[in-house]
Design a protein with these regions (language model features):
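Conserved MFS/SLC helix-loop-helix module at the cytosolic interface between two early adjacent transmembrane helices
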Residues: 21-59
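Residue-level signature of mid-helix packing/kink "hotspots" within the transmembrane helices
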Residues: 16-24, 74, 108-109, 271-279, ...
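Juxtamembrane intracellular "pre-TM" segments in multi-pass secondary transporters
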Residues: 155-232, 458-463
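Symmetry-related core transmembrane helices of the 12-TM Major Facilitator Superfamily/SLC fold
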Residues: 130-149, 310, 418-437
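Cytoplasmic helix-loop-helix junction between adjacent transmembrane helices
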Residues: 65-104
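Structural signature of the two symmetry-related core transmembrane helices
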Residues: 37-51, 297-315
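Helix-loop-helix hairpin linking two adjacent transmembrane segments in secondary transporters
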Residues: 100-154
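Extracytoplasmic gate region of multi-pass secondary transporters
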Residues: 226-279, 345-349, 353, 380-388
Length: 484
């Protein structure tokens, strides 16, 4: 609302800010170059464009900055996801992705809560929303510097400067996770030939391979031709519609009669539930996956349960809670239901990411994550406009937000928006259940094909001692480059 007033944009125009499309090029780049540098550049671009949005004076300027900002974010997410998959074995990837989801959700919650409350103020003489964007820009640039200085891509350790003239010890070549072993089961850094010799014997996958169109077409065809990938993407497309539709929750709470502060804290409570739910779902997927090894059934069953329980809970939230009168009296009830709702419906993302990591050889993981984000983001973004269209043209929403014709109109608008939200959440979730069911038959064979492809190509050197040594050398070299 604050951005809309400042840039003279309607709500429908502001919705286009969330429809900026990004390219899967970032995944193709991340699979061939050091992903830590790709992530650092993405954070830097993200920070600069976020500052540009905060300084925009028209919707056109904001749209251009937002589009470039989306590309910076696209550089970050697929590469970070593939790095997490490389650092963790299959039976702990769900929890690892859950931790990433937890931190992302907590950051988004804190940012949204802060921006909502600072939007009506004028810190340092500027509009509150502009100040919030500039603050995020500063944090993004600092993050870029930290990633550049300290992050290490395990896939590129075989040619990292820390290896030259050093020794490797206790390293194993694995296709799914990191390992270190030596005689007696402990890692060792002695007794092996110099790293340069090891590197010369067998380089990692495409260590210095140039980015050619033939390789791009090959990778794209492999990824898009995987049946389980197609199914998970279809599930993700329809499954992201409810999440985008939930951006209307704040408007819905305000129409119910909650103050701006109460609406913000309720949404923060919902975000906390989602953050913890991601970690819970990933952990449950890992545990059930260990009980059903070498199959996707454990993670898929966890996802199906999350989708299934979300349907009745969404009905309780949108239609079963008291409305009207003094809504402050129902603040605790709404907060409890929103927390449990978020805790229950957020299990799928972490398990889907863990499943993706097993569908392709590890040197194509950035590509598969990038295409997933591209398809889901482009089509799933329709959720927000669908809610508005359904509320206005199907369920009879009248007027504009902030201008109503009295309590009767407000109540009818609440009912219309609640019904639209319910339809745009439950119907996609029904399709999600069907798509997840298909994975029980397709995933195992697709995973077997990925392992066969992985065995045909050289695997990277991996090991925790090597990661630590490379990180130390990277920091030392950066310090040495600084002028005294």
């Amino acid at each position: 609302m604050f951005i809309g007033r400042s840039l003279n944009a309607s709500l429908s125009q502001l919705g286009t800010l969330t429809l900026a499309l990004t390219s899967p090029i970032s995944g193709l780049v991340g699979d061939r170059y050091d992903r830590s540098y790709v992530v650092a550049f993405g954070c830097l671009l993200w920070g600069v464009m976020t500052a540009a949005i905060g300084l925009s004076r028209s919707l056109g300027q904001a749209l251009v900055s937002c589009a470039v900002n989306g590309f910076g974010l696209a550089l970050v997410i697929p590469c970070v996801s593939s790095i997490i998959a490389d650092y963790n074995p299959p039976d702990t990837r769900g929890r690892a992705f859950g931790i990433m989801s937890l931190t992302a959700s907590l950051g988004g919650m804190a940012g949204a809560f802060y921006a909502t409350n600072v939007g009506a103020t004028r810190p340092m003489g500027m509009e509150g929303w502009r100040f919030a964007f500039l603050l995020v820009a500063v944090i993004s640039v600092v993050t870029a510097a930290l990633v550049y200085r300290y992050a290490v891509d395990p896939r590129h350790l075989h040619h990292h400067p820390s290896l030259h003239g050093g020794s490797l010890g206790g390293l194993t070549r694995t296709g799914s996770g990191m390992g270190a072993s030596s005689a007696g089961g402990k890692s060792s850094m002695a007794g092996l030939p110099p790293a340069a010799d090891v590197e010369g014997q067998r380089p990692g996958p495409r260590a210095a391979a140039p980015l050619t169109w033939q390789q791009v077409v090959r990778d794209v065809r492999i990824v898009l031709g995987i049946r389980s990938f197609q199914i998970i993407v279809l599930q993700g497309i329809v499954g992201s519609i409810p999440w985008v539709a939930m951006t209307w929750f704040t408007t819905w709470l305000q129409l119910l009669g909650f103050s701006d502060l109460y609406a913000a804290t309720l949404m923060a409570t919902f975000s906390i539930g989602c953050a913890l739910g991601g970690l819970l779902g990933g952990t449950l997927g890992d545990r059930l996956g260990r009980r059903l090894p070498n199959s996707p059934h454990g993670r898929v069953l966890v996802n199906q349960f999350s989708v299934l329980i979300g349907m009745p809970m969404s009905f309780v939230l949108l239609k079963g809670l008291p409305s009207g009168g003094d809504m402050a009296a129902h603040y605790g009830l709404y907060g409890t239901v929103l927390f449990l709702f978020g805790l229950s419906i957020s299990w799928c993302g972490c398990n889907n990411s863990a499943l993706f990591a097993e569908l392709v050889p590890e040197e194509q993981r950035s590509t598969i994550f990038a295409f997933d984000r591209s398809f889901e983001g482009a089509v799933g973004a329709m959720g927000a406009p669908l809610v508005g269209l359904a509320a206005e043209h199907v369920f009879g929403f009248r007027g504009v937000l902030g201008s109503s014709d009295g309590r009767v109109a407000d109540r009818s608008n609440v009912a219309a928006l609640s019904s639209a939200l319910l339809v745009c959440m439950v119907v996609p979730w029904v399709f999600c259940l069907l798509f997840f069911t298909a994975l029980h038959w397709t995933f195992k064979e697709d995973r077997r094909r990925a392992f066969r492809r992985n065995d045909e190509e050289p695997l990277p050197l991996e090991g925790q001692p090597l990661v630590e040594a490379a990180a130390v050398r990277k920091r030392t070299e950066l310090v040495a480059r600084q002028p005294s």
